[in-house]
């Protein structure tokens, strides 16, 4: 089985930054990978297109995926509002790791984060389901618009997304 690849085209205050592509580890976490893939294509009638990265902390991560409330309190999965932690096989080994944001055990929705450093303290708490394939330089550019409290100096938006 070939793992799916999806892409995000990123803008900062409507200025194009570029494209980030992700490999989704459907071989290890099929349910979590399928949620992210379908939210990237928008095939269920809702998803990531037009949503923003509401929290970016340089040297840590870029968080997005709240397409319902746009502030980190919302989002929904393709399985209903929330779904369970599939497994913790994969670890937060360094920059480019794609992982699910949550509000505690078994509260996965649509929010996710892209690591910009090794974040091993998140192992066993957040489900890793992918990694940046191309465009880590774009993630680094996004990081420059973040701050220590996570507030962004420009609106970092997923202007387009889909499956490659």
Swiss-Prot record:
* GO CC annotations on file: cytoplasm; cytosol; extracellular region; extracellular space; myelin sheath; nucleus; protein-containing complex
EC nos: 5.2.1.8
> What Gene Ontology biological process does one annotation of this record name?
neuron differentiation
- Catalytic activity, as annotated: [protein]-peptidylproline (omega=180) = [protein]-peptidylproline (omega=0)
Query: In this chain, where does the modification N6-acetyllysine occur?
Result: 28, 44, 82, 125, 131, 133
Q: How is it modified after translation?
A: Acetylation at Lys-125 markedly inhibits catalysis of cis to trans isomerization. PPIA acetylation also antagonizes the immunosuppressive effects of cyclosporine by inhibiting the sequential steps of cyclosporine binding and calcineurin inhibition. Acetylation at Lys-125 favors the interaction with TARDBP.
UniProt-annotated location(s):
Cytoplasm; Secreted; Nucleus
Please give the activity regulation comment for this entry.
Binds cyclosporin A (CsA). CsA mediates some of its effects via an inhibitory action on PPIase.
Q: Where is this cross-link: Glycyl lysine isopeptide (Lys-Gly) (interchain with G-Cter in ubiquitin)?
A: 28
In terms of CDD domains, this protein maps to: cyclophilin_ABH_like
> Phosphoserine (modified residue): where?
77
Q: Which domain of life is it from?
A: Eukaryota
Q: Which PROSITE patterns does the record cross-reference, listed alphabetically?
A: CSA_PPIASE_1 (PS00170), CSA_PPIASE_2 (PS50072)
Q: Which residues carry this modification: N-acetylvaline?
A: 2
Indicate the cross-link positions, Glycyl lysine isopeptide (Lys-Gly) (interchain with G-Cter in SUMO2): 28, 82
Q: What molecular functions are annotated in GO for this chain?
A: heparan sulfate binding; integrin binding; peptidyl-prolyl cis-trans isomerase activity
Q: Which UniProt keywords apply?
A: Acetylation, Apoptosis, Cytoplasm, Glycoprotein, Isomerase, Isopeptide bond, Nucleus, Phosphoprotein, Rotamase, Secreted, Ubl conjugation
Where does the PPIase cyclophilin-type domain start and stop, copy by copy? 7-163
Carrying Phosphothreonine, the residues are 93
As for what it does, the entry says:
Catalyzes the cis-trans isomerization of proline imidic peptide bonds in oligopeptides. Exerts a strong chemotactic effect on leukocytes partly through activation of one of its membrane receptors BSG/CD147, initiating a signaling cascade that culminates in MAPK/ERK activation. Activates endothelial cells (ECs) in a pro-inflammatory manner by stimulating activation of NF-kappa-B and ERK, JNK and p38 MAP-kinases and by inducing expression of adhesion molecules including SELE and VCAM1.
| Protein name as catalogued | Peptidyl-prolyl cis-trans isomerase A
Question: Lineage, please?
Answer: Eukaryota, Metazoa, Chordata, Craniata, Vertebrata
Q: Which gene encodes it?
A: Ppia
């Amino acid at each position: 089985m070939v793992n799916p690849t999806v892409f995000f085209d990123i803008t900062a205050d409507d200025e194009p930054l570029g494209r980030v592509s992700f490999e989704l580890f459907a071989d290890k976490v099929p349910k979590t990978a399928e949620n992210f893939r379908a939210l990237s294509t928008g095939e269920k009638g809702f998803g990531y297109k037009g949503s923003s990265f509401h929290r970016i902390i340089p040297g840590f991560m870029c968080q997005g995926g709240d397409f319902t409330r746009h502030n980190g309190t919302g989002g929904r999965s393709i399985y209903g509002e929330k779904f369970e932690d599939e497994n913790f096989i994969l670890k937060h080994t360094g920059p480019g790791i794609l992982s699910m944001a949550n509000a505690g055990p078994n509260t996965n929705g649509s929010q996710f984060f892209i690591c910009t450093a090794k974040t091993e303290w998140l192992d066993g708490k957040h489900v890793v389901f992918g990694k940046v394939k191309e465009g880590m330089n774009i993630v680094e550019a996004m990081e420059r618009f973040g701050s220590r409290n996570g507030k962004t100096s420009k609106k970092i938006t997923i202007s387009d997304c889909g499956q490659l």
